[in-house]
Every structure is written in structure tokens, then in C-alpha cells.
Amino acid sequence: MLKELIGGLDRSTGTSEAESLYNKQIALESRYAGRGFADGIAEAQENIRKGKGGRLRPAERMIALWFGEMESVVRQAVKIAKSDPDKVSAHYAPGLALVVGTSPKIATATAMMTMISRVMRDPSGSSYTSCATEIGNLLQAEAEVIAMRKLLRQRTKRCREAGDLAGIRRASRTRKKVNEFGDRHLIHKAAANMTAAEGMILETRGKIERTRAGAWLIELVKQTCIIVKQDKTEVDAFRVAKEPGVKKRRLVLYAHPDMLAHLDKGIKARAAIRPRCPIMVVQPPSWADTQAGGYLVIRKGIVANAGPMHKAELARHDMSRTYAGIDAMNRPAYRMNGRILDTFKHLWCDEQSCPVLPPQEDPIAPTFPHADIVPKDKYYRWKRSEEGATWLKSVEGSRWRMLWRGHISKVRELKADRKGMVMLMSAAKDAGTSAFWIPNRLQCQGRQQPMTQHLNGHATDLAEAMLLFDRPVEPGEDGREFMALQLANAWGLDGWDKRPLAQRVRFVDEHRQMIEAVARDPLKNREWMMGDKKTRWQFLAACMAWHDPEMARHAPSSVDCSCNGLQHSAAMSRDENLGRLVNLMDTGRRENVHGDAAALLLKRVQADAARGDKWGTQMVGQVDSNLCKQPVMTHTYGVTHRGRVEQFAGKLEDRGWTSPSGGPSPEAYWASSYLAKMMPDVMNDLGRSAMDMMLWQQESVKRIIRQTNQPIGWLTPIIGFPVVIEKLQEKTRQIRTCEHRLSMFVPVEDMVIDCDATVTAIAAMHTHSLDGTHNMLNAMECARRDIDYRSKHDQFTTHSGRMREAKKIFAEQFVELHKSDLRLDLANQWTERYKVDLPPLPERGTLDLNAVLTSPYFAS
């Protein structure tokens, strides 16, 4: 195999050097695969140790095989017990009422999950009595949950009859809390409080009754669950026997060794198929199959998280153009930016706090007011006491809980960021000083996705700044201009990245002293840390490249498309007004669709403020281009009202509208809801044709799903990549008990398409598929012209010395993509595939697509 790889892929090095590189790559992939396997096994063992082994996927699959028959057995046993209790063994009779009081589905899931979890934790045998008691305790908790839900229904009915809206909302919030309970002690306390408030007494079963109920279910499981050995003989999966060598009679629950071996094998197999992916020290092998490409040893699918329906479509269609596009993306070789790496190491290792890196110490936790009288190890017991529960419901207690939750959330984020930094350092160590490659594959809608996790152009600002092209290209005078644009775009403050190109080029002249000082000593001259927080490291890398001629030959320069989703929508519908706003034509200046949307929104807000509207008055000084950016960009993706509210609230949070626990304040959400209601009308004023096309897609999807119950799919233009939207009402059947969550896969033939979710996703998925197609066309044409190229959605990157030529390619491929009527092509595909009458296509605009070829701000 190694000789075949060397002979088939190596082009520039000697055989011995190539063999050394391939051996290094195989060792690297094996190490990463082993690391991923070890992490998967450790995670599974931790779940088993906690008694949650039944939640692991191999255990769930085994339960799914038995569940249907076992549920029928329990249902029949309960039916007999109700009609003729004398037929139930006297030993189990005390627990009869507890099993009858819960549904057979819940009782079955509780018994099977508990038994499998216990035998996985104790393979040599688990206490029978303890297991039965645990099952009985969980059944008692389920009975209490049922009682609380019944009381809440009665309370809601009384409030509805009395017209008490506040009471209805309180009951709804309480119902949500009840559904989220995961601790039987909390359930018991809540049920006791609720029944006491209603003047009732909570009915609870004694320990003997609970144990007998659990024992009855264990007996039913023993009689029902069998496994088939290799010699085709059937044996019981569980057995109960007296513990050997003990004088006192003690029963033990055992699992069949073949069953435990099967579970262990499943856990190891699941851990083995999720390896981590390293960089490549040799050029990635070409994709030749949907499951083989990108790596020498590691096997990953060409589409991330493809479902069964999508995999079937991939197998049915010609993927040769798709393979060629991904191979073109995998073509560029990189090297580490040593100066950026050294700066990072110094700041990370020698400084505790730095604005461009996550702090290495957790923030100080909020002080617990009763810490002097409640020891830390007694807090959870005190919290359940009457005194603790009363204090936590008070204003002071509620505020402290909000602060504590915000602190925990912040600590988790910081831990994830620190882990990312460590993994990035590890990847940089693997890269060393030699050339390396970054393999890519596709997301389900056809967008590019790097297979390496931390060191790639889609990861953090720091990771992107660490990447240099391995091949040198002289920038020349033309390239120096694009390097100046890179500096202005990465600085980002004072609107430099939004100014006309001629002004952005002058950024270097106005900031030359700062650029040279930062490039000479970034640790002493830290002005670069004050730039746009999203691109600080890239600005530092651009300063170093401007100052160092050798680095300039390898440094990347990037251009961004102007709201690329709207560009595709405007081109597809030939909407001239929207095309002008997103720079599909040369108007003599850089158009700003976010600014135009903000101006229209501000007019509406000012009109409301003039009428004395509360939120209109508060929002007059807040509406600007930055506030409207996300809602405008995502409108053609089918963003919902709730999504717009979250987007506006996030921006207001950055402006000081925060709650004590972190996150947007309630006032920020009210103001955001006020603004979000106006955005659809604002976007319709900007470009009606593109909005009509989105509505046509949504209406067509509704008709198709309601008439055929088939997933929505199409082939992307030119490339022919099959896209499938697998939005299902139930991919798995969820059975929720107070302690367990059991997931069982629904057979493909029984799957029901989720119409609402698909309608919401169609606009975004179709636009992203066009975005991914444009990216692959760019990559293939750049490869044909020997230009190193990488992309991050609508951000295109290459050497500064080749950027002028590459920009022309980006515009040409965009025109080539939209040359035909993509609306008609989509309608024809759907009509032919689903045999459904679709609504008529909306009227097309008059945009001249060739204007893109002369627009300087199409990608800038």
C-alpha cells in the first residue's frame, strides 16, 4: 500500500524522503485515531461508573430489540392484574398498584434501562434487591409526576374559567419544570408541596411495595429477554441466583457473558469510528468514493453527518465533479507562521491575562451569603430544607442563583476555549516547520468543511493567522495594494473595512508608524490588541507580512463578498434594486445594504417615538448598520421572528443591556421583539423579487411534503452534488422517564418528514448550496491556473500577488453559476422528482448579470 501511495501521489521528492513522509503521516493518523478511541472508551466507562450505561448507544440498540415484545408482556400482565388480581403471585401483589399506576411503556423503559446499567457497572453480579428497590423508587417518582401533571391540568382549567392569565402562565412554567426534573428526591418534594397546596395528601408506597413492584418487572424481563448464541441456541439474557459462598441468602442479578461481550464490542466499535483528524504532512489522496478520501488510514465520509436518505442519494448520482472540487480545495500546501506561533506561546505561557487569549484562571465565583453558617459540603442538603427553599425563592436568593448560573456558564466557556488553545498548540507541534495540508469534505448542503478541528481557516482568528501558504509568490506593486487592503480590513475599527478601496489603501500611510512598531516587537507594542476582536491576530500577521518581504511572499490576503446570501438571491431572481445594494453592479461607490436597511428601520422607529411609543423612544439612538447586520444577512435564509429577536438581543447585550447572570436583559428582549416585527417589511422594501422567490420555495416545499411525505432534495447546478434536507419528526423515538432517556431509531419506512422544519430550512439550504457550488467552481478554476486558494464561506483567500487575477475568477464563476435560470431548474427538478403541481414562479427582474464582472466591490 505504501509503495502504491508513493508512486501514485508523490511528485516532487525522492523515494526515501517520500516514504519517510508517508510513514510519518500514517503514524500521525494512527495516533489521532488512538486518541479518539481512548477518549470514547473513557467517556463510556465514566457513564457506566455513574450507573448510566443504559444510555450508551450499544445498550439502547439492544433494548430496542427487546422493547416491543417486553412492552406487550408488561401491558398484558397489567391488564390481567387489573381484571383478576388473584392471578398475580402473592409475592408481587404488594407492588401491583405501583406498576398499574404508570404506563407500560414507562415501566418497561425504567426496568430495562436500570437492569442493563447495573449489570454493566457490576459485571460480576449486581444485588437483586437493590436493583428491584431502585426500579420501584423510579416508578414511585413517575407516579408522583403523573399526579403533579393531573393537578396542573386541574389548576390550568380553573384559571382558564376564571380568566386568570397570570395563573395560566405560572402553571405552564411549573409544568415545564416538572418535565425537566431528573432527581426523584426533588420530584417527591415538589409533589408533596403541590398536593399540600391543594389540601390533599400525597399517596406514597412503602419500601416493601416499591421493591416488590421492581421485582415483578425484573421477573417479566427475565422471562422475555433472550439472546441468540453463535451456535444458534437461545439463552436468557438475565438470570437471578444465590450469591455463592455466602451463608446468608442474598440474590444476585447476572447478565449472560455473551450479552456483556456484545455491549463491550459495541462500545469499542463506536469509539473506533469517531477518530480525531490531524493535518496531513503529505498531499491528501484524491476522493474516489464517498467513504474514502482525504486521509491514508482514517476513514471519514465525504459528507459530514449524512443520514440514510442522503447516503442513498450520494450512491445514486455521479460524484466525479464533486470529487474534483474537493480535491481542488485540498490542493494548497501550508506552513506555520513561526512569528505568530512564538508570540502566542509567549503570551500563553508567561502571562496570566491577555486581551487576545482566554484567561488562564476562572473568574471569582459570586459569594454565597450564608457561607458562614452553611458549609460547602452541606449546601445541597440545606437547599432542600425549608429554610433553604424559602431563601432561594426570595429576591436575594433568586439574584444569587442567576449570578451563579452565569458564573458556571462563563467557566465552561473558558474551559472550552483553553482546551482549544492547547489542541491548537498540539496541531502546530505536529506541523513543525515543514509543509502540511488541510483535508476538506462537505456539509450536507454542499459547503466546505475542514476535517481538522483546530488548525484550519474556519476555526479561530488565531488559527487563521498561523497559516501561511507554503509556495512563495512575489507580491509586486499590485500585491502590496492588496496587502494594504488586508491591513485595513483586519483592523476593522472606525469603519476602515467599509470604506472605498482607495481610502482603505491609504490605511498604511496613516498608520505606518504603528504597523512597523507592531511588526518589530508585538509583545512590547500592543496596539494590535486594540483592533477588531474578531481579527486581531490576522491584523498582527498582516503587519508582520508588510514589514518582512520574505513573509509577504507566503502571506495570504482575503476578500469578502458583500452579503453573499443576498447576492445569490438577487442574481437568481435578477432583482436589480437588491443587486445594486449588494454590489452586483458598479455604482461608483461601495453600497451598504445593512445601512440602507437601518435607515428604513429608523424611519419606522422615529415615527413610533413621535407617537410616544415606549420602545420606539428607547430605540431611536440604537438603530444603526451594525444592529441590522445579522437580521439582514439571514433574511433570505428564512430566519424566524424568534431568530431575529435573538440577533437583536445579542447586539443590545454588547451595548450594555445585560442581566445580572449574563446574557441580554428582559428589556433587551422586549426591545428586540419590537424591532423584529418591522424587519420583514423593511426587507420587502429593499428587494421584492428575492423575497417572492423565498416564499415560492417555502410554498412549494409545503405542497411536496404534504402530498408525498418525501425529503426535499435537488442537484446543485454544474457540480451535480445531491442535497437532501432530512428534517424528520422522529429520527428516534424518545421515551423519557424521571431518571432515563431512551432513544430508539425509527425505521426508514416509518419516518415522517417534519414539514415546518423543512419549510424554515429550505431558503438557507438552497442559498448555501449555491454558495458551496460557487466555492468549488472557484477552487477548480484556481487549480487550473495554478493559484493557491482557500475559502471560508464567502471569504476568499489567496496570495496577494495573484489576488487581482483571482478576483476576476470569482466574478466569472459567479456569472457562470447564475447564467441559466436556476429558479426554473429547481422547479423542473422538483416537478420531475415528486410529480406535484407547484405554484407559478414569481416574476423575474431585469438585472444584467454581466455587470458583476466590472463591479469592484463584488468581493472586497
Language model region names:
Residues 765, 769-774, 778, 787-802:
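C-terminal, well-structured subdomains that either form a transmembrane helix-short loop-helix hairpin
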